[in-house]
């Protein structure tokens, strides 16, 4: 990987990490279409340190408040009923499923899960699920001849059950093409949360798992380590990609939260389905192979 590739992939990572379109799928597809080597799961995980740093800075006041309340809840019983303390505990609870599955499925994540046929399929399927969840969230409750707005939850309503279900939804993002934010936001909408609450909790929930994964994969960068193509993944381009991902990721968070406050997820649904169908067409036509850029067995 050279510095130009690192810059482009960092830009892709930052622009797509927080949108429900799957950053890992876009990194894989971009490299395949450009004729580059597969950057690999380790590169993806490390560059996500940049985007999660953007989350830390963007939500710094919320995070500081949550951490403080969570810490106080260890010694002060009354704090255990505090919303921020509960969010802190449930973020940790929701991280357990993806942590366990990430370790168990590591070989699949770095190998079969990166098959472009699987990625195309998950782009389409999760896109349809997101569309259904968004439709459900906007659909009114029938009452006689009329329909009333469906009551929506906020983070104040977050329960242990919901926290665990959010965590299970996040686990699906181990497959490129699913999208961490897409899966957790869809889950949140189906559980009855507002778009804004589902998105905010999605970003907060991702931090422990993504940062831990990125730090864990640092050992796979540089030296004699290899990416998905069997070639060395160098430190220089990876650092550049991470910095670019941070800058573009911060802008993407701000834009996305403003966007969903007044609009639906329909454009993202259409984009996911169209991209998945295009990818399947390219694969069927032989323009690219399902394992393009991957290491040979």
Swiss-Prot record:
Transmembrane segments: 39-59, 89-109, 118-138, 203-223, 237-257, 268-288
Mode of membrane association: Multi-pass membrane protein
Annotated Pfam families: BacA
Keyword Chloroplast attached: no
Gene Ontology biological process terms, A to Z: cell wall organization; peptidoglycan biosynthetic process; regulation of cell shape; response to antibiotic
Keywords assigned: Antibiotic resistance, Cell membrane, Cell shape, Cell wall biogenesis/degradation, Hydrolase, Membrane, Peptidoglycan synthesis, Transmembrane, Transmembrane helix
Stated role: Catalyzes the dephosphorylation of undecaprenyl diphosphate (UPP). Confers resistance to bacitracin.
Protein's name according to its UniProt entry: Undecaprenyl-diphosphatase 3
């Amino acid at each position: 990987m050279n510095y130009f590739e690192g810059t482009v992939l960092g830009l892709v990572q930052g622009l797509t990490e927080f949108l429900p379109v799957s950053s890992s799928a876009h990194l894989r597809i971009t490299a395949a279409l450009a004729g580059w080597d597969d950057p690999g799961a380790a590169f993806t995980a490390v560059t996500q340190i940049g985007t999660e740093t953007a989350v830390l800075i963007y939500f710094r006041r919320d995070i500081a408040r949550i951490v403080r309340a969570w810490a106080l809840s260890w010694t002060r019983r009354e704090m255990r009923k505090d919303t921020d303390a509960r969010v802190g505990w449930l973020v940790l609870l929701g991280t357990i499923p993806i942590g366990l599955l990430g370790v168990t499925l590591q070989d699949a994540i770095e190998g079969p899960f990166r098959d472009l046929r699987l990625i195309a399929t998950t782009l389409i399927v999760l896109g349809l699920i997101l569309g259904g969840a968004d439709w459900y969230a906007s659909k009114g409750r029938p009452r006689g001849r009329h329909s009333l707005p469906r009551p929506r939850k906020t983070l104040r309503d977050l329960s242990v059950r919901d926290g665990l279900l959010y965590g299970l939804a996040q686990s699906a993002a181990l497959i490129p093409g699913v999208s961490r934010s897409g899966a957790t936001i869809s889950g949140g909408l189906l559980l009855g949360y507002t778009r804004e609450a589902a998105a905010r909790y999605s970003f907060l929930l991702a931090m422990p798992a993504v940062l831990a994964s990125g730090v864990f994969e640092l050992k796979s960068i540089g030296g004699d380590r290899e990416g998905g193509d069997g070639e060395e993944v160098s430190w220089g381009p990876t650092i550049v990609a991470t910095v670019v991902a941070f800058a573009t990721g911060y802008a993407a968070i701000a834009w996305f939260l403003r966007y969903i406050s007044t609009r639906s997820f329909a454009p993202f649904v259409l984009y996911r389905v169209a991209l998945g169908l295009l990818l399947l067409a390219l694969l069927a036509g032989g323009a690219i192979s399902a394992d393009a850029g991957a290491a040979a067995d």
